[in-house]
UniProtKB/Swiss-Prot annotation:
Subunit details: A double ring-shaped homohexamer of HslV is capped on each side by a ring-shaped HslU homohexamer. The assembly of the HslU/HslV complex is dependent on binding of ATP.
Family membership noted in the UniProt record: Belongs to the ClpX chaperone family. HslU subfamily.
UniProt feature, compositional bias: Basic and acidic residues: 163-172
Location within or outside the cell: Cytoplasm
Single GO term (MF): proteasome-activating activity
Known function: ATPase subunit of a proteasome-like degradation complex; this subunit has chaperone activity. The binding of ATP and its subsequent hydrolysis by HslU are essential for unfolding of protein substrates subsequently hydrolyzed by HslV. HslU recognizes the N-terminal part of its protein substrates and unfolds these before they are guided to HslV for hydrolysis.
Region span, Disordered: 154-174
UniProt entry keywords in alphabetical sequence: ATP-binding, Chaperone, Cytoplasm, Nucleotide-binding
Name under which the protein is recorded: ATP-dependent protease ATPase subunit HslU
Organism: Geobacillus thermodenitrificans (strain NG80-2)
Length: 464
């Protein structure tokens, strides 16, 4: 189970995707393990143990967000990333800080719902296949009266059959044959007409911006249930229709009240909220006046959420006491001490992330499971091209990335995306027509494609 991973094992898992930043990985690994330790305590003490929130300090592109995202994915915890600059003080137009908790609960509901639907997938598939058989071999239509008032005007209700007719036996025989063909994948490309529930039109979205969202009420859900449900017909291949029907049947098999309760519990006990750009709402020396007051107001609004409070959502009240908050910022223009003292105290663990070196860039290019070079190799393999990079070429690319970051804005590892795209631009364009099955990238090729751009500072700023 991911919840029982030791801090060392968590760091090893994170190492598969993120290069360096040992201190930051260590801090989040301890925070995650402490959650597991807390779950083993008796209930009275468990409520007293609060998570130690983390403040990550470091330039953009060094792995702050990725560490938090991978951590959440590792344990299947609900995770959201928000930007502190998007929030406004209560009473002003814009998003209030409580919306981050509502977003977390939405993510949690989606996670739990997907998990529950995967648990009933086999049963849902059986029901979907039954419906497909009935659609492919429809039975004899019986006369039924949907409106009881028809009886007053001479209509007759359908009588139940006392036995099977010859036609019914033929239909059953045909259905058994079709069921066997479906099970053996012989009818995947056959066309079938299915009825699916149509989503009600989004009529009430305009109300959400008028403060309704802050009340924890979803007008679409509240008023949508009063509107009649419409069904529309779609003609699909059996393989596609099965997916639609499995989804419909799975929805019927899960209890949404149970999903909601579990989702709220998961968000409260395991949720992770990543607040980016928190340095932008700190009191910098160069900022004064109303903007400074507004920033401090947002900090004071964030404070009760981080301290622990109850937020109303459309799924019910959610306590934030045990949600793990990870804040991050570059802190170029401000210092962590420029945050209001109360908020500083709520982020007791501070980790400084190092700037990336040339060696870090080399490692980022080749070591992670999702390394950029591996991605480009996989993309070009679809065109029948075996793309290779010499070790010297990889180091040259890393040196170019480091140099451009030094001479222009430092955007960390994101610089590699721009550089590799520029380096391989011609190859990606010509790949379908080039007629080669092997291409080797050398230092000379890197110099040829990027050398002049790197030397010209103006070009670097615009192109790389």
């Amino acid at each position: 189970m991911a919840e029982t991973l030791t801090p060392r094992q968590i760091v090893e898992r994170l190492d598969q995707f993120i290069i360096g930043q040992k201190e930051a990985k260590k801090a989040v690994a301890i925070a995650l393990r402490n959650r597991y330790r807390r779950s083993l305590l008796d209930e009275k003490l468990r409520d007293e143990v609060m998570p130690k929130n983390i403040l990550m300090i470091g330039p953009t592109g060094v792995g702050k967000t990725e560490i938090a995202r991978r951590l959440a994915k590792l344990v299947g915890a609900p995770f959201i990333k928000v930007e502190a600059t998007k929030f406004t003080e209560v009473g002003y137009v814009g998003r209030d800080v409580e919306s981050m908790v509502r977003d977390l609960v939405e993510t949690s509901v989606r996670l739990v719902k997907e998990r529950k639907m995967s648990e009933v997938k086999d049963r849902a598939e059986q029901q979907a296949n039954k419906r497909l058989v009935e659609l492919l071999v429809p039975g004899k239509q019986k006369q039924t009266i949907k409106n009881p008032l028809e009886l007053l005007f001479g209509g007759q209700a359908s009588q139940p059959d006392n036995g099977h007719s010859h036609d019914d036996e033929q239909v059953e025989k045909k259905r058994r044959q079709v069921a066997w063909q479906l099970a053996n994948g012989q009818l995947e490309d056959e066309m079938v007409t299915i009825e699916i529930e149509e989503q009600p039109p989004m009529l009430f979205d305009f109300l959400q911006g008028a403060g309704i969202e802050q009340m924890g009420v979803n007008m679409q859900d509240a008023l949508g249930s009063l509107m009649p449900k419409r069904r529309k017909k779609r003609r699909l291949k059996v393989s596609e229709a099965r997916k639609v029907l499995i989804n419909e049947e799975a929805q019927k098999l899960i209890d949404m009240d149970e999903v909601t309760q579990e989702a709220i519990r998961l968000a409260e006990q395991s949720g992770i909220i990543f607040i980016d750009e928190i340095d932008k709402i700190a009191r910098g020396k160069e900022v004064s006046g109303s903007a400074d007051v507004s920033r401090e107001g947002v900090q004071r609004d964030i404070l009760p959420i981080v301290e622990g409070s109850t937020v109303m959502t459309k799924y019910g009240p959610v306590k934030t006491d045990h949600i793990l908050f990870i804040a991050a910022g570059a802190f170029h223009m401000a210092k962590p001490s420029d945050l209001i003292p109360e908020l500083q105290g709520r982020f007791p663990i501070r980790v400084e992330l190092a700037k990336l070196s040339v060696d870090d860039f080399v490692s980022i290019l080749v070591e992670p499971n999702n390394a950029l070079i591996k991605q480009y190799q996989a993309l070009l393999a679809t065109e029948g091209i075996n793309l290779e990079f010499s070790d010297d070429a990889i180091r040259k690319i890393a040196e170019v990335a480091f140099e451009v970051n030094q001479t222009t804005d430092n955007i960390g590892a994101r610089r590699l995306h721009t550089i590799l795209e520029k380096l391989l631009e011609d190859l990606l364009f010509e790949a379908p027509d080039i007629g080669l099955n092997r291409v080797v990238i050398t230092p000379q090729y890197v110099e040829q494609k990027l050398g002049n751009i790197v030397k010209n500072k103006d070009l670097s700023e615009f192109i790389l």
